[in-house]
Amino acid sequence: MLEQNKFKTKKQQQAWNKTLAGRYYNAMVKRPFLFFGLPFLTTIYAASVYFAEFTAYRYEIQDGKVKALSEEEALKLDKGRRKVDMKEEFYRLQQLGKQDDWEQVRVPRMKGESDNVF
């Protein structure tokens, strides 16, 4: 919480310096890396190590959902498939492309819209 008085009297300052916050502030002013930087970096490192376990657990769960197929299961899947010949597929797809019964129709423009003809 912000204090109302910006400046403290000597008596107030001495009382504040005796508190834990006052002693920590004075130590931080003298050695900022030791009392601010080092705890900050330690917290960041500890959090990364702590959250790495959660990430590993998440990937373990995902791996459990995706299971490897055994040879028997793979053979069961192959039973129902039809055999594919490249030439037959090529000619089949060519026949699908021969649809010349369509007609290009221009979409009417809205009133006031330009034709974009150069």
From Swiss-Prot:
Membrane topology: Single-pass membrane protein
GO biological-process terms attached to the record: mitochondrial cytochrome c oxidase assembly
Domain of life of the source: Eukaryota
InterPro entries per the UniProt record, alphabetical: Cyt_c_Oxase_assmbl_COX16
Keyword terms, alphabetized: Membrane, Mitochondrion, Mitochondrion inner membrane, Transit peptide, Transmembrane, Transmembrane helix
A Pfam family matched in the record: COX16
Compartment(s) where it occurs, according to its Swiss-Prot or TrEMBL record: Mitochondrion inner membrane
Principal subcellular localization: mitochondrion
TM regions (residue ranges): 32-52
Gene Ontology CC terms, in alphabetical order: mitochondrial inner membrane
Summary of the function given for this chain in its UniProt record: Required for the assembly of the mitochondrial respiratory chain complex IV (CIV), also known as cytochrome c oxidase. May participate in merging the COX1 and COX2 assembly lines.
Similarity section: Belongs to the COX16 family.
Protein's name in the database: Cytochrome c oxidase assembly protein COX16, mitochondrial
Organism in which the protein naturally occurs: Yarrowia lipolytica (strain CLIB 122 / E 150) (Yeast)
Gene that produces this protein: COX16
